Structure formats: structure tokens, C-alpha cells
A protein has these predicted regions:
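Short structural boundary motif marking the start of a folded domain
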Residues: 1-4
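Short strand-turn-strand beta-turns centered on an Asx-Gly dipeptide
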Residues: 6-9, 53-54
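Short, contiguous acidic and Ser/Thr-rich linear segments
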Residues: 9-17
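Iron-sulfur-associated redox domains of electron-transfer enzymes in respiratory
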Residues: 16-68, 74-78, 206-570
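Fe-S ferredoxin-like electron-transfer domains
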Residues: 46-190, 203-222
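Mobile "lid/hinge" segments at catalytic clefts and subdomain interfaces of large enzymes
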Residues: 162, 195, 382-386
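Charged, low-complexity hinge/linker segments at coiled-coil and domain boundaries
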Residues: 197-203
Length: 570
């Protein structure tokens, strides 16, 4: 506890990590380019530089607050200093702003306007670098990189992947994979978190918008869409809807307007995953074999496991992800001439996740050699399509998702938040022993945004020990302990993105603490408002098992990672 003088006003501080946080607490939005509260302090951009009473300047992001400090944030000297920094950054920056995919959301562009930088006095003498579009998930354009280091620290600090780093020195410095390899040839897991923190257009989503428009225009095609749970609590943010509000009904109406023939709910696929994964888990748990069971619905986590811990691949659930279960079932359904009207099917997923773009290409995501899902659009891409079509979001009437795949349980909806898969499985496995008490489950430790959570749940007199992890650096930390025998779990849920899919790499940007919490609570509220709480109580799922899935459960809902690896290596 202490106080400091900021621009002539006394401001008290308690546990703020740096002077920058105290300044913002005082209501002053000091500019930054390289500072993120969840990443390590870098202090490279120097935009947050302030001046003390003796005229000494320092970066406020890397200075601890001290009682009695006197600082100034907006002196003529600092204003000039910040403008020069932006000028120098722009001088070595590709300035095709009007056609840049990040235009309107570019932090560098915003700061140039805010600080009054209208001319750049310096010539750009940098040699252009080739664009790296080798990944199915992201595109890297080094010509738009300002060397802020945010992507490097995200990939290292939070994800523990280290697929990119700084290379070369001085004016030749760039951010690059090792040995300038294409990003697709590295350990990159396609999580897209680098894109989330990139302040410019240097890292962007690899878009499928144009091919989806083409499919919608084809009269000989049935185009169907599935909407993931996390999308419904984020898509409205760009249209003035309160953060975290569930806009599923609006999205269904909008997708119908865009030309999609049928719009379904991925929560239905999540219910199928719960049914199969809970069965698989109980078989292993009762036999005491191949434990822990790791969830496998996050493709970025699956790839991380394959790259770093191949010995744990046999412990991955054989269940397909909700997206892929849904895709296989829907494609089987539309094989029936009564359902396809003689037209070909194009299956599109609306996802919060860039890694889903890679998942649909994996060998184990195909049925009889054919992709079950044709294209993945992220939440951000869907927002772009809505804007291009000129649809006024607030004026679209709410519509229900189409049957037979448009009904999902509350358990399926909470898949989009960390701990949701574990909670959904626990709701299911207590059936026949002790009916799941929702309040008891909520307070068991499955909820909350801690990176690593541990719960012990009583199942018919036996203890189920489970871990819930979000963020791959946290997963790495936990896996090392499991591998060494230091700890043991029966069930481990892993999501690559911190807090789960609500914070996926394909979600809208500018997600501060309030946004993160609002999205998580939005899914929990959607669960509360859903009449069906458990996956096994979904009547549409029950009828599927009695009909289309008879004799085809393993073929359509499961995968073999070992066989898929052989196929990839052919």
C-alpha cells in the first residue's frame, strides 16, 4: 500500500504490478504496443515511457510503483517522443492499410491516428520478406511485423510451444520459425494465440470466406452450418451486443439469410462426445487401465501431445471432437436421397478456433477417405461475412436451429469453457448411481479460470481424481509431473487456449478481463436456460442411437490415432 503523484494528482496503489497499472487505475490510457498483462514484461516499444520529477524517463511497464513517486505522463517531451516512435515503426512497416485484413482493428493504425502521426519522414529501406501461408490456420506477413515480441512471448510463456522467436540482429531482425522454415513445418499447433496478441496484420487468420460464398451461390449444393457453443457468446460483440450475451437465435437467422440451407448446433455433437467419452472413461476406470484418459476434442492440444509427449497418445480419448462427430453423422444423414434432393453437400463449421481448420484435414477426421467437414469459418470470419452482406444484426429475428441436429443440452453448451467437458462427463456418469447435483458439481472445482484445477469426485464410493488444464504451458507442466509419477489422475481435460474455447484464436479481439469473464458466464447462463441439462437426456441424441448410428457408432464417432499416424507417414 502506498501512493504516488501522477500528473499532479495523488493516486493510491496496492498490489499493482507496475507503474503502468497505477497510471491506468488513475484513468489515464497511456499507449502501449508490447504490453500484455498476461505476458512477461518486455519493454521494447517504449511508448509507455513516463518522466519523473527530475526529468528522467523510464518505461512504466517495467518499473515497480514506489511510495512517494512523482511522475508525468503527457509532457511535450513525451508527446514528441511517442510520435517519433510511431513514425519509426511506420517507416519500416508495410503501409497498405486500406487492403490489410487488420484494417480498422490494427493497434498501430489506431495509435498513429491517436498521436497525430499523419506523415512519415523516413524512407522504408527494408527488403520485403515472403508471406508464409503454409499453415491451414494462420498467415504470417513479416512485412507488417513491428518486432513487439507479443507473439513470441505468447507462444513461449502461455503456450510453451516456442514455434517462433527473434532471428538476426539490428535492422535485419525478424520474428521467424527456426531456420526460416515455413510455420507448417514447425511444432506450431495452430492455436492462433499469436494472432490474438499481434497488434498489426503480421499474423492473421487464413480465411475460407470466398470459397464458402462460392458454395452458397451454387444452386446444386446443400450448404449446412454448425455453430460451436463459444461462438454464440462472442459474435455479438462486434455489433454492439453486450459482451457474453447468447446470440445463438440471431446467428441462426443470419446464416439462413446468408443462404445456408440448414443451421445446426455443435452442442449436439458435444452431447455425442459426452456419451462416448463417458463410456470410454468408465471402461478404463473400472478396469484400472490406460489412465489417465486425456480429452481429445481440442486439436491444438492433440498436436501438442503428438509433438512433445507421444508416449501419452494411447491415453488420448478415441472419441472424435464434437465438430468431427457432428460432421460424420451429418454426412451419413445426407447420403439418404430423401434428405439430399439429389444435391451435393457442403458442410461448414463456425468455430472459435483456428486449429479446427487443421483438424478437418487430419487423416482420422475423414470417413472413407473423404473430409467430413469441408470448411471451417472462425467467429471473426463469420462477422466479416455478416458485414459484407450488410445485415443489420439487431434487426434480425431470432430463429431456432434446424432439426434433427439443432438441439443440444446444457452439458454440450458448456464445452466452450474450461472445465466444461469434465463437468459434462461427470453429469453423465453419475446416472444410475447418484443423480448429479448441479450445485455440487459447480462447487467441486470444475469452474473458474485457473490454469490448472484439480478435483476429487465421489463416484459410488470411489474417488475420481481429475485435472482440468487450459494453456499448453500449463499442460506441459502437468504432463511432466504425470510422466515422472509425481501425481496421478484418472481423467485430464486439456484446452490449448486459456479459459477454453471462449478465448480461442478465432474469436473477436480486444478481450480484456471483463470480456473473458462475460463470455464464460454467458455459456453458464445458457446452460441454466437450457431445459435439457444432461447429454443422455437429449431426445434427438437418443433417437440417433436407435436409428442412424445402429452398427456404425465406432465408424462415425471414433478414431484411431495410431492408424492415422501411419497414414500421414505413407
Amino acid at each position: 500500500m502506498g501512493s504516488m503523484i501522477i500528473d499532479g494528482r495523488r493516486v493510491e496503489f496496492t498490489d499493482e504490478p507496475n507503474v503502468l497499472a497505477v497510471i491506468r487505475k488513475a484513468g489515464i490510457d497511456i499507449p502501449t504496443l508490447c504490453y500484455h498483462s498476461e505476458l512477461s514484461i518486455y519493454g521494447a516499444c517504449r511508448l509507455c515511457t513516463v518522466e519523473n520529477e527530475w526529468g528522467k524517463t523510464f518505461a512504466s511497464c517495467s518499473e515497480k510503483p514506489k511510495d512517494g513517486m512523482v511522475i508525468y505522463t503527457n509532457t511535450p517531451r513525451l508527446i514528441k517522443y511517442r510520435k517519433q516512435i510511431i513514425e519509426l515503426l511506420l517507416a519500416s512497416h508495410c503501409r497498405d492499410c486500406t487492403t490489410c485484413i487488420k484494417s480498422g482493428e490494427c493497434h498501430l493504425q489506431d495509435l498513429a491516428h491517436r498521436l497525430g502521426v499523419h506523415d512519415v519522414r523516413f524512407e522504408n529501406t527494408k527488403e520485403p520478406h515472403p508471406i508464409d501461408d503454409s499453415s491451414p490456420a494462420i498467415v504470417r506477413d513479416p512485412n507488417k511485423c513491428i518486432l513487439c515480441g507479443d507473439c513470441v512471448r505468447m507462444c513461449d510463456n502461455v503456450q510453451g510451444v516456442n514455434a517462433i522467436d527473434f532471428a538476426y540482429r539490428g535492422t535485419e531482425a525478424i520474428v521467424s520459425p527456426a531456420f526460416n522454415k515455413p510455420i507448417a513445418q514447425t511444432d506450431c499447433v495452430n492455436c492462433g494465440q499469436c494472432r490474438v496478441v499481434c497488434p498489426t496484420g503480421a499474423i492473421s487468420i487464413k480465411t475460407n470466406i470466398d470459397v464458402v460464398w462460392d458454395a452458397l451461390a451454387d444452386k446444386d449444393t446443400i450448404v449446412i452450418a454448425q455453430i460451436a457453443p463459444a461462438v454464440r457468446v462472442a459474435a455479438g460483440e462486434e455489433f454492439g451486443i453486450p459482451k457474453g450475451e447468447n446470440v445463438m437465435g440471431k446467428l441462426v437467422g443470419i446464416l439462413h439469410r446468408l443462404g445456408f440451407d440448414e443451421v445446426y448446433d455443435t452442442a449436439y455433437g458435444a452431447d455425442l462426445t459426452v456419451m462416448e467419452e463417458s463410456k470410454e472413461f468408465m471402461e478404463r476406470f473400472n478396469a484400472g487401465e490406460n489412465l489417465p484418459l486425456f480429452t481429445s476434442c481440442c486439436p491444438a492440444w492433440v498436436k501438442f501431445c503428438e509433438n512433445r509427449y507421444p508416449e501419452f497418445v494411447p491415453h488420448l480419448s478415441s472419441c472424435r471432437s464434437p465438430q468431427q462427430m457432428f460432421g460424420a453423422v451429418v454426412r451419413e444423414y445426407y447420403k439418404n436421397p430423401e434428405n439430399n434432393a439429389g444435391k451435393k453437400l457442403v458442410s461448414v463449421s463456425i468455430m472459435p478456433c483456428t486449429a479446427k481448420k487443421e483438424e478437418i484435414l487430419r487423416p482420422e477426421s475423414k470417413t472413407n477417405g473423404r473430409q467430413d467437414i469441408d470448411y471451417v469459418l472462425t467467429t471473426t470470419e463469420l462477422i466479416s461475412m455478416i458485414k459484407r452482406a450488410g445485415i443489420m444484426f439487431d434487426q434480425v429475428e431470432i430463429e431456432s436451429a434446424d432439426v434433427p441436429f439443432g438441439i443440444g443440452s446444457g452439458a454440450g453448451v458448456i464445452f466452450g469453457v474450461t472445465g466444461g467437458v469434465t463437468e459434462a462427463v461427470l453429469r453423465k456418469i453419475t446416472q444410475g448411481h447418484k443423480r448429479a447435483d448441479m450445485e455440487e458439481l459447480k462447487s467441486s472445482g470444475v469452474r473458474g479460470d485457473d490454469g490448472i484445477k484439480e478435483i476429487v469426485y465421489d463416484y459410488n464410493g470411489k474417488e475420481i481424481k481429475a485435472a482440468i488444464v487450459s494453456g499448453l504451458a500449463n499442460a506441459d507442466q502437468l504432463l511432466k509431473k504425470i510422466k515422472s509419477g509425481e501425481i496421478h489422475y484418472d481423467f485430464v481435460e486439456v484446452m490449448a487456449c486459456r479459459r477454453g474455447c471462449v478465448m480461442g484464436g478465432g474469436q473477436p479481439l480486444d478481450a480484456g478481463a471483463h470480456t473473458r469473464e462475460a463470455r464464460m458466464q454467458g455459456l453458464y447462463k445458457a446452460d441454466v436456460n437450457t431445459q435439457i441439462k444432461k447429454s443422455d437426456e437429449n431426445p434427438m441424441v437418443q433417437s440417433l442411437y436407435e436409428g442412424l448410428l445402429k452398427g456404425k457408432t465406432h465408424e462415425l464417432l471414433h478414431r484411431n490415432f495410431a492408424e492415422a499416424e501411419k497414414e500421414k507417414n505413407k
